[in-house]
Swiss-Prot record:
Originating organism: Candida glabrata (strain ATCC 2001 / BCRC 20586 / JCM 3761 / NBRC 0622 / NRRL Y-65 / CBS 138)
Protein name per UniProt: Pre-mRNA-splicing factor RSE1
Gene expressing this chain: RSE1
Pfam family, one: CPSF_A
Signal peptide: none
InterPro entries: Cleavage/polyA-sp_fac_asu_C, RSE1/DDB1/CFT1/CPSF1, WD40/YVTN_repeat-like_dom_sf, WD40_repeat_dom_sf
Length: 1296
């Protein structure tokens, strides 16, 4: 079995973040990174905006910092787990973001890395700690080539371990390290200086850090700017010119500011209020800090954040009464109320601050209301301080959530609970959905019988002015839009036809013409540009007697009519008059659909015609001898009748022909008007219902020029990087459900449309008004007959696959409604606006989800543990339909959150062969509480819940599972099969003891005959439940695995994950299955067969054959995240195959797709191999080009210059290599950033097997067209660029 792996939602625990001007000298960007990928955000305005795509790293990122060049541009310094140190800069081409390597050095990866390596950069050097014994310096010279010199290695002092490292940015080549002498147990503060002349790292001074109290230890250091600039005397003698850097050291109870020369030692205690409020077992730690130089260099702002969430401001100023010696104060600044432990603070020069938190849901963007006063009281905490206010809050999937709940598979929807505040009884629910949310602005019921709508906006109008409603009773209703109101409009007589005919088409033509096409006639009405209600009849046209108009299509100057006698009528607008061309071609079959290229500036050269013989013909509209040729230039045969057509211009003489078919399939063909060639680029079966309408909506998500703060001269600076938004065309497809086809980041997608009440839309048209922006707004008719005005503001794409809808639900006893917290529909890009006064401190809880369907109500039971030491948890019930809380009975009361007097470990739900639902809740004390539950119909509560009994087990229980009419309870190395008794759970049967099993942590069942158990040490075992009610262990794994999750894929196949970040598939072979079947699962016969076939091996190695059979390893893959759960979905969003979803502890959502056809496997394998070898291909090819260039220069000197060779070199280097080359040659790691060995990474703990890495395949999509062409030519000559892109997008569009 071959699987294709894709990460749909990347890890969200951002362990690294750095700020800098990465894309321009005066820009404000922030880089955030997990262990596996890098993201870039623009902070120019008050809302952060994501720039380009993610940079995926196929290794673990250990350290990240920035180094600034002489032009004020920031470069990234990265250190990977593979031992590679890389300096790179960002390059933005359109919407494609790349990291271009400038320097690469490989350290000895065999060095013991007991302590996490650290990287800090100064202006002209980079300092790295690698292993326990080494410090490495990389000299940097921005004015010379090569800029980065060979690293210089230095040994640490004996028995010394580097705990913290920082760069003194105001002093070139100066560093400070906080080190621990492991022998003497002494903390040391070392000032280091890299001497360029001596090429040596010098220890300029060292201090032992001591405290009078045992529990007051140094744990943090940070940079302080050059205090001499701010009038502080940093030396004893004014005459000395030697620089004296300062550094801040954080202890558990105070901070200490020391200088390099040892002259000053300034100590500031933390406020007593904080120290007294700390729990006995908690120490105060400084977890983050940042420094911002104020405008005009008038001062600096240095903020510290503690693990309690408090922000402190450090003030250092000269003592004018004592020779300007420094005075330091530690002042309370403010508190970030819902983030107590951030990993980084970032202060930007536009007066804002970003807090990055690794172990929390939220990353907060704040605004400075004030930077405080130096004369404030610094001894106490002032809870009324309001120096900062929250601008927005960005919510991620909880990095340590134990599970997600799969709500539905059409559209693909997950539910994730955010932190809850137990005092306010509120919860935050994140609905993560792979769909295009249609944001609803207005919804209004319409008269019964509306079958179609048309919106009208002429060239003279800025907004749409009329909506035409087509009724099934052969009438037409006109609605007028004015001043953001819609009302019925009755025009003057002898203009529009409103009765006794069915309107099939209404549109504008030319500057001021409106055409209305009915079954029995069409009319052209002229509109006065000065008076929107002054209509004038210009033309009436009637078909021949006994003939009706079946369909019509028009653009700015052309109108095509399809008649019931199979004739096509062509009319062209000239001088506000529609002129009919005499020739009317007659087709052999009934015309079902028409399409013209709708371009306001050009005439369409082609006409697409669908006919009842399952054909689509593309006819030429070229005028020959004053007649339309109607020559068939392209045709396509279909499997069913084409029901709707649409043509959209793609530029460069290319058009896309969209085809909706009666059998529910949807196709997109690319037509080249230069040679009239046609190629299919997308095909998807969307259901069984006919695709009745294809509607085009222009969506403009492009961000206009972003404004920066004024510079020092008062002039505002504009961000020139305008290419960060998106402008595209959305084709809305109406069938069984509503879908949308669109292009995003140069790739084509098709995703379902989502409406909150799951309404199906019949048709959709463009719409705009004075209060609704036209970019992405639309007017739709729902199947229930209501008019819906809404808009698009999020389109899923490879780099942002899910939208997020944050919903706040009130769980207090006096509230029963769900309150929406606003649509954060942009997934991970846009932020959610928040009211600071409503922010509460959120905790991280362990949750279990359980789907419960009873009496037509689909709900989710949510069990939540507190993170404190109290033995309690809570249960709440969420209605899947509207994400609202449901009431539960609790001691005769109706509550939304039921308290349970224990912590929950696992849950199970079953009827156990009765009519009554039983809920089994396993506590952490190995007690199972059995509840009887049912959905109430008496209106008092939504769910009635009654405790039946509780059963305690002696040995620790980690999981439970319902099997047949029994509850499986693992006890040490065997399984107990229990049934519900009157006073406790009763043992119905006991499974056999499994000798090699130590601790059963997970369970899964297949149908009524097989059980899989996962052991924390000894992998997976497969058990068989025989017809004689015996349980036999029939197979196990040959490897030891620390299993965290398992799931049956079929009767013989199990997928699982372990704590080392690997996913694997185990299977019982077909041959072994045949043996089991022949033995009828009889234990005696199986033993005889085992002795007969494998007796010799059993005698030699009895521990190997401790079961009848062994599970074969079918697939193995490293995902770099611990899997907490799997879901197997047969049909997801009209996919053509089942999908395996997995959820990771760091917030990952991924999938494994089975590849069913050999051609799929070979294509995707070739793409994977091309990208795996891309770095090698790039480097070797360009080394060859370097040699050619050298030969060329030598030949030029000898006047033997070959123009042909020059042409090849110029083409190869000038178009591709020229932007990436350096004077020292081409840098390795062009495509994988950290130059990782992909196979080694995906085989981190075990060799990868039968899994194609879709993540590395999709990095091809983020390359520029030049790089794509170059790589395809040299690494995969059998493929072409278009084929590769279509193959990758087919996976996204058809498989998921």
């Amino acid at each position: 079995m071959e699987l294709y792996h894709l990460t749909l939602q990347r890890q969200s625990n951002y362990v690294h973040s750095v700020k800098g001007s990465f894309l321009g000298r005066d820009s404000n960007e922030l880089v955030v990174a997990t262990q596996t990928h890098i993201e870039l955000y623009d902070f120019a305005g008050k809302v952060r905006r994501k720039v380009g795509n993610d940079i995926v790293l196929f290794t673990s990122l250990l350290a990240l910092d920035t180094i600034w060049d002489e032009d004020g541009l920031a470069h990234l310094v990265m250190l990977g787990q593979n031992g590679n140190l890389v300096v790179a800069k960002f390059a933005l081409s359109g919407d494609r973001l790349q990291l271009d390597s400038e320097f690469l050095y490989r350290f000895d990866n065999s060095v013991e890395k007991t302590w996490l390596p650290k990287v800090v950069a100064n202006k002209s050097s980079i300092l790295v700690t690698w292993g326990l014994t080494q410090k490495i310096v990389v000299p940097v010279s921005w004015s010379q080539e090569p800029r980065f010199r060979s690293p210089i290695f230095f040994s640490n002092a004996e028995h010394s371990v580097v705990l913290e490292l920082c760069s003194l940015t105001s002093f070139e080549d100066h560093y400070v390290s906080l080190e621990l002498d492991t022998r003497l147990k002494v903390y040391k503060l070392n000032f280091l200086f890299f001497d360029r002349n001596l090429q040596s790292l010098l220890l300029t001074n060292s201090y032992n850090l001591k405290s009078n109290e045992v529990d007051d230890r140094p744990n943090f250091i940070t940079d302080i700017p050059d205090l001499a600039v701010y009038g502080v005397s940093t030396a004893i003698n004014k005459s000395t010119s030697k620089k004296n850097p300062f550094v801040l050291i954080g202890f558990n109870k105070h901070i200490l500011i020391k200088d390099m020369m040892g002259i000053y030692s300034l100590k500031c205690e933390f406020p007593a209020d904080i120290m007294e409020s700390l729990p006995m077992d908690k120490k105060l730690l400084i977890v983050a800090s940042d420094l911002q130089i104020l405008k005009n260099n008038v001062g600096f702002l240095l903020l510290l954040q503690t693990n309690t969430g408090h922000l402190f401001k450090v003030i250092i100023f000269p003592n004018e009464e004592d020779r300007n010696r420094p005075i330091a104060k530690l002042g309370y600044f403010d508190k970030v109320k819902h983030i107590s432990n951030s990993s980084k603070l970032h202060i930007f020069n536009n007066g804002s601050m970003y807090i990055n938190s690794q172990f929390n849901y939220d990353h907060v963007y704040l605004n400075f209301e004030s930077i405080g006063d130096n004369d404030e009281n610094y001894d106490k905490i002032d809870n009324e301080n309001e120096n900062i206010s929250v601008i927005s809050k960005h919510t991620n999937i909880n990095p340590i959530a134990l599970n997600l709940c799969l709500m539905e598979n059409m559209p693909l929807t997950f539910m994730h609970f955010q932190g809850g505040n137990r005092t306010t009884d509120s919860e935050k629910v994140n609905i993560i959905r792979n769909a295009i949310p249609l944001k609803e602005y207005v919804s209004s019921p319409l008269p019964q019988g509306v079958s179609n709508i048309f919106t009208i906006k002429t060239q003279y109008q800025s907004y749409h002015s009329f909506i035409f409603l087509t009724m099934i009773n052969f009438t037409t209703v006109i609605l007028k839009i004015a001043d953001d109101s819609i009302e019925q409009y009755i025009p003057a007589s002898d203009t529009f036809k409103l009765k006794d005919d069915m309107t099939i088409h209404v549109a504008t033509m030319g500057d001021n013409s409106i055409i209305q096409v009915c079954k029995d006639e069409f009319r052209q009405i002229l509109l006065d540009s000065k008076d929107e209600e002054n209509f004038k009849m210009n033309l009436k046209w009637y078909p021949p007697a006994g003939v009706s108009i079946l369909s019509a299509v028009s653009n700015f100057s052309q109108l095509i009519l399809a008649l019931s006698n199979n004739e096509i009528v062509y009319l062209q607008l000239e001088n506000n008059t529609l002129i009919e061309y005499k020739n009317r071609p007659e087709l052999p079959d009934v015309i079902t659909s028409l399409a013209l290229l709708n371009d306001n500036t050009k005439k369409s050269e082609i006409l697409a015609v669908g006919t009842s013989d399952n054909m689509v013909n593309v006819l030429s509209l070229e005028i020959v001898d004053e007649a339309i040729s109607f020559e068939t230039v392209v045709f396509q045969a279909l499997d069913a009748i084409p029901s709707s057509l649409l043509i959209l211009n793609q530029g460069h003489k290319l058009v896309n022909l969209h085809i909706g078919v009666e059998d529910g399939s949807y196709l997109v063909n690319r037509l080249d008007l230069r040679n009239m060639s046609i190629n299919n680029i997308l095909r998807k079966q969307l259901g069984t219902r006919s695709i009745k309408a294809l509607n085009h909506i222009g969506v403009d998500l492009r961000n206009d020029t972003l404004q920066y703060d004024d510079d020092e001269s008062g002039n505002s600076k504009e961000n020139t990087l305008k290419n960060r938004g998106e402008k595209t065309s959305v084709v809305v497809i109406h069938g069984n459900r509503t879908w949308a086809n669109y292009s995003s980041h140069s790739n084509m997608y098709i995703r379902p449309l989502y409406l909150k009440d799951s309404r199906r839309l019949i048709t959709t048209k463009e719409f705009s008004s004075a209060s609704i922006d036209s970019g992405g707004s639309c007017c739709s008719l729902s199947a229930s007959g209501s008019l819906l005005i809404g808009g698009f503001d999020f389109l899923p794409w490879v780099g942002n696959w899910f939208s997020k809808d944050a919903v706040a639900i009130q769980l207090s006893d006096d509230s029963s409604t769900a309150v929406s917290g606003g649509d954060s529909t942009d997934g991970s890009d846009d932020d959610e606006d928040y009211d600071e006064e409503k922010l509460e401190e959120f905790d991280i809880h362990c949750r279990k989800f359980l789907n419960f369907n009873d009496q037509g109500k689909s709900t989710v039971l949510v069990f939540e543990n507190t993170i404190d030491d109290k033995a309690e948890s809570t249960l709440c019930i969420i209605n899947k339909k509207d994400i609202s809380p449901m009431t539960i009975s609790d001691d005769g009361k109706s509550v939304f959150r039921k308290s349970l007097p224990f912590k929950t470990r696992d849950v199970a739900l079953s009827k156990l062969g009765t009519k009554k639902w039983y809920l089994f809740v396993l506590s952490t004390s190995s007690t199972i509480f059995t509840y009887g539950i049912k959905t109430s119909t008496d209106g008092t509560v939504d769910l009635k819940m009654e405790l039946i009994h509780e059963t305690h087990f002696d040995n620790e229980v980690f999981c439970i599972k319902v099997f047949r009419d029994m509850l499986i309870v693992p006890q040490y190395n065997r399984l107990l099969f229990c049934e519900v008794g009157k006073t406790k759970l009763l043992n119905k049967m006991i499974g056999p003891a499994v000798d090699y099993v130590e601790k059963i942590t997970v369970l899964d069942c297949w149908a009524d005959d097989r059980i899989a158990i996962g052991d924390f040490r000894n992998s997976v075992s497969l058990l068989q439940f025989s017809s004689s009610h015996e349980v036999n262990v029939i197979a196990n794994d040959i490897c030891t695995r620390d299993v965290t999750a398992i799931k049956f894929l079929d009767r013989s196949t199990i997928i699982g994950g372990d704590k080392f970040g690997s996913v694997w598939v185990l299977r019982l072979s077909i041959q072994d299955e045949k043996i089991l079947q022949s033995c009828d699962n009889n234990k005696v016969e199986l033993q005889q067969h085992l002795l007969r076939e494998k007796g010799t091996l059993r005698e030699k190695a009895p521990n190997i054959l401790n079961t009848y059979f062994k599970l074969d390893l079918v697939n193995q893959f490293f995902i770099n995240d611990i899997v907490t759960g799997f879901s197997v979905e047969e049909i997801t969003q009209a996919s053509d195959r089942p999908i395996i979803f997995y959820y990771g502890i760091q917030g990952t959502i991924g999938c494994l797709l089975p590849l069913l056809v050999k051609s799929e496997i070979s294509k995707l394998r070739s793409i994977e191999q091309m990208m795996k070898s891309a770095d090698e291909t790039w480097f070797l090819k360009n080394e060859l080009l370097n040699e050619k260039i050298g030969i060329e220069l030598e030949d030029k000197e000898n006047h033997e210059y070959d123009l042909a060779v020059h042409s090849v070199i110029d083409h190869e280097v000038g178009r591709t290599a020229g932007n990436w080359a350096s004077s020292s040659g081409f840098i390795e790691g062009k495509f994988t950033t950290l130059d990782c060995d992909h196979t080694a990474y995906r085989s981190y703990y075990a060799p990868v097997k039968n899994v194609i890495d879709g993540d590395i395949c999709e990095t091809y999509l983020n390359l520029t067209d030049d790089l794509k062409a170059y790589l395809t030519k040299h690494a995969s000559p059998d493929n072409d660029l278009t084929t590769i892109v279509q193959t990758l997008m087919k996976v996204r569009n058809n498989f998921i």
